[in-house]
From Swiss-Prot:
Protein's UniProt name: Glucose-6-phosphate 1-dehydrogenase
Gene it is expressed from: ZWF1
Binding-site list for NADP(+) 1: 7-14, 36, 93, 112
Taxonomic classification: Eukaryota, Fungi, Fungi incertae sedis, Microsporidia, Unikaryonidae
Residues given in the record as D-glucose 6-phosphate binding sites: 112, 137-141, 175, 193, 280, 285
GO terms assigned for molecular function: glucose-6-phosphate dehydrogenase activity; NADP binding
Function, in words: Catalyzes the rate-limiting step of the oxidative pentose-phosphate pathway, which represents a route for the dissimilation of carbohydrates besides glycolysis. The main function of this enzyme is to provide reducing power (NADPH) and pentose phosphates for fatty acid and nucleic acid synthesis.
UniProt EC number: 1.1.1.49
GO biological process annotation, one example: pentose-phosphate shunt, oxidative branch
Pfam families linked to this entry: G6PD_C, G6PD_N
Length: 434
């Protein structure tokens, strides 16, 4: 049995895919790297330049240089027990799917973005995808795995997850890392890189109503959310941090920051703005979903969550409360908490902590995480959360209105290392107060 990594000379393969493969049980499994790059040193040396690997793992790895429009070198390698994994530019996908149809294989894993446009995705959809899994590793983050069950089984949380209580929902991803050396990012931008996949899936998870513990039901529920989503294109804003052009050594109108408001046309979420915020070159790495409650239900929220009305120093009266938020912090805390703002100071009440969430994650996937789960599942034929072609198509349809336009004349510029651009803060306030 073999795992073939297409694009094995790339950043993702070297930073995440090969390290994940080295941490799972690969007894009886060989690993083949395939890419256009020709090396004048052993591929094992290439891998060791960016990671630490055991001699046992490196002995399993071979490397084949070759083009993506001619996979004849793989005919002797790939058989009905071979896992194929796409970690190549999405512009290559159509060509690669065409060539792979000439090979035997067990299953294909496909990295996001699934194509470089909605048109190219529809071309991909025209191939036989019966043995293809579209991958989004955010669906395998511990809190994202646990979230449907937490919402379903925590009475207070389930009660407040609707427009009867919620004023707005922010889905936020902040990264310190910029675009340094990443030509892939400059071609795609933050919307195609993050929003079309990871942030869209987080929206689907938090807004869906899953009544039974089933991955199929969870996926269907996300799809129902996406069918009802509309992007407010007039209020979207796009930014680029001020050092970006210097870092990539060329002029660019690629957005490194975006704020995307979305409405969900269902009775449950009608008139609640969902605001996706994603940025690189920020002051911290943080991923979280923030549900802000309406002022008229503050007291009810405090009662529902049985939150003590006493901070560390004094009693908190309802009329002193400025804001009440329910936060699903995916990173770095990995916990669910209620946050009450009193006198400008937040009082936090943890509802589900990291230890509990890690336990729920272990119940679902054992001791593996992220790409370890993906490769172990593909190799062993196990079920795991992934994206169907129908779900991927719906996400393309939701975000295509802002993916298909030039943003060159729309960009604002922000300082690298900022907490949040003032342009985004002002627009978020305007949307919430509308």
């Amino acid at each position: 049995m073999k795992v073939v990594i297409f694009g094995s000379s790339g950043d993702l393969a070297k930073r995440k895919l090969f390290p994940a493969l080295s941490r799972i049980d690969l007894e009886g499994v060989g690993v083949v790297g395939y890419a256009r790059t020709k090396y004048n040193i052993e591929f094992s040396e290439v891998l060791q330049e960016v990671g630490n690997y055991s001699p046992e793992f490196l002995s399993k790895v071979t490397y084949i240089p070759g083009p993506y429009d001619d996979l004849s070198k793989l005919k002797e390698v790939s058989d009905s027990e071979t896992v194929l994994y796409f970690s190549v530019p999405s512009s290559v996908y159509t060509c690669l799917f065409r060539e792979i149809s000439k090979l035997d294989y067990k299953v294909i894993g496909v990295e996001k973005p699934y194509g470089d446009s909605i048109e190219s995705f529809m071309e991909i959809k025209g191939f036989d995808l019966g043995k293809t899994r579209f991958i989004d590793h955010y669906l395998l983050k511990p809190l994202v795995v646990a979230m449907p069950g937490i919402i379903r089984e925590t009475g207070a949380i389930r009660e407040v997850m609707s427009n009867r209580y919620v004023k707005s929902v922010e889905i936020v991803s902040k990264e310190v890392l910029g675009g340094e050396g990443r030509h892939y990012f400059d071609k795609n931008g933050i919307i195609r890189d993050m929003v079309l996949s990871h942030m869209g899936e987080l929206l689907g998870v938090v807004a869906s109503d899953v009544t039974k513990p089933s991955r199929i039901m969870e996926a269907l529920a996300r799809m129902e959310v996406f069918k009802a989503c509309t992007v407010d294109t007039e209020r979207c804003i796009y930014g680029q941090y001020d050092d970006y052009i210097k870092e990539i050594h060329k002029d660019s109108s690629t957005e490194t920051f975006c704020m995307v408001p979305i409405s969900i046309g269902t009775p449950r979420w009608s008139k609640v703005p969902f605001i996706i915020v994603a940025g690189k070159g920020m002051n911290e790495k943080r991923t979280e979903i923030i549900l802000e409650f309406r002022r008229d239900v503050f007291a009810k929220c405090i009662e529902l969550f049985s939150m003590p009305r006493q901070s560390s120093c004094r009693i908190v009266h309802t009329n002193e409360i400025e804001t009440v938020r329910l936060v699903f912090n995916i990173y770095p805390e990995c916990e669910v908490f209620l946050e009450v703002l009193v006198g400008g100071e937040p009082v936090r009440y943890v509802l589900h902590d990291k230890k509990e969430i890690d336990g729920l994650m272990h119940d679902s996937y054992g001791g593996y995480h992220d790409y370890e789960i993906i490769f172990d599942s593909l190799v062993r034929g196990k079920d795991f959360s992934s994206v169907s072609s129908q779900e991927a198509e719906l996400l393309w349809k939701v975000f295509n209105p802002i993916l298909s336009i030039s943003k060159e004349d729309m960009l604002f510029y922000y300082s690298k290392g900022i907490d949040m651009p003032k342009e985004a803060e002002e627009m978020i306030r305007e949307i919430k107060d509308h």
